[in-house]
From Swiss-Prot:
Domain of life: Eukaryota
Protein name, UniProt field: Large ribosomal subunit protein uL14c
Gene Ontology cellular-component terms listed: chloroplast; mitochondrial large ribosomal subunit
SMART domains: Ribosomal_L14
Chief subcellular location: plastid
Stated role: Binds to 23S rRNA.
């Protein structure tokens, strides 16, 4: 469960290292989970990269520390809160994705991110 003011690790090579959630898209919602799109501000970035510090970006959540319950009864939990920076067309701004992602991203039509991921759980 991600809410406003939550810090997330960026799991791609767009240049950002950490972002802070400032808005959850999709109505008047308090919390976001895996596969939800948020608006965040870049708090830490690598120099000489496309994404700079204090840029406002869109991102999709790909890992959360909170347990996710699936319909088949399985529960899954990750070690960190992580997101991938996307553009207006929901395509990733980076060319690589680091770490495992949840299968729920495939159901929410983020197939480009799923194809870049090294492992889908």
């Amino acid at each position: 469960m991600i809410q406003t003011q939550t810090y997330l690790t960026v799991a791609d090579n767009s240049g950002a290292k950490k972002i802070m959630c400032i808005r959850i898209l999709g109505g008047n919602r308090k919390y976001a989970s895996i596969g939800d799109v948020i608006i965040g501000v870049v708090k830490d970035a690598t120099p000489n990269m496309p994404v700079k510090r204090s840029d406002v970006v869109r991102a999709v959540i790909m890992r959360t520390k909170n347990t996710i319950r699936r319909k088949d009864g399985m529960s899954i939990r990750f070690d960190d809160n992580a997101a991938v920076i996307i553009n207006k067309e929901n395509n990733p701004r980076g060319t690589r994705v680091f770490g495992p992602i949840a299968r729920e991203l495939r159901d929410k039509d983020f197939t480009k991110i799923v194809s870049l991921a090294p492992e889908v759980l």
